[in-house]
From Swiss-Prot:
Family matches, as InterPro entries: Smg (IPR007456)
Protein's recorded name: Protein Smg homolog
Residue ranges of the TM segments: none
Pfam families: DUF494
Source organism (scientific name): Nitrosococcus oceani (strain ATCC 19707 / BCRC 17464 / JCM 30415 / NCIMB 11848 / C-107)
Protein family membership: Belongs to the Smg family.
Length: 159
């Protein structure tokens, strides 16, 4: 099984983060379950690090930059290597329609860049966006919109 950190994160998201379970499992019990599901210890550790990084970024004091409607995000060469034109266009679209604000966009880009995935595509980006929005207070409508988009596409693939 060729899995990466994103596969572990998607597994956790689908089974735990998106559920209304009252008692959350411990990190140790999750590690055991993920190992039994076939994930490698190294990838499990990296996934937990990724989630801890997300939590730290969300707890830190947000830096507010003056942003106008005519502002354009310039991507670095490294970001362009990870996020192809389709991914960058999708982020721009989400920002233009009001699903993302500039702070959330930057948080998403940071979390994408923290992944070691070599073949990162639009479907992966949608999952990262969904995971980030699920942890953002006040982003319930944006999360619901992305959840519909991601899970409608998944169910279309299954039928």
């Amino acid at each position: 099984m060729k899995e990466n950190v994103l596969d572990v994160l998607m597994y956790l998201f689908q089974n735990y983060m998106d559920s209304e379970v009252e008692s959350q499992p411990t990190k140790e019990s999750l590690e055991v379950e993920l190992t039994e599901a076939g994930f490698h210890h190294a990838e499990i550790g990296k996934a937990f690090d990724w989630l801890e990084g997300l939590a730290l970024l969300q707890q830190s004091e947000p830096r507010r930059f003056p942003v106008t409607n005519s502002s354009i995000r310039i991507f670095t060469l490294h970001e362009k290597e990870k996020l192809d034109t389709e991914c960058r266009g999708f982020l721009l679209f989400l920002e233009q329609v009001g699903v993302l604000d500039s702070m959330t966009r930057e948080l998403i880009i940071d979390r994408v860049m923290a992944l070691e995935a070599e073949d990162f595509d639009l479907e992966h980006l949608k999952w990262v966006i969904l995971m980030v929005l699920s942890h953002q207070p006040g982003q319930e409508a944006a999360y619901a919109w992305m959840e519909d988009l991601v899970f409608d596409e998944v169910s279309d693939l299954l039928h």
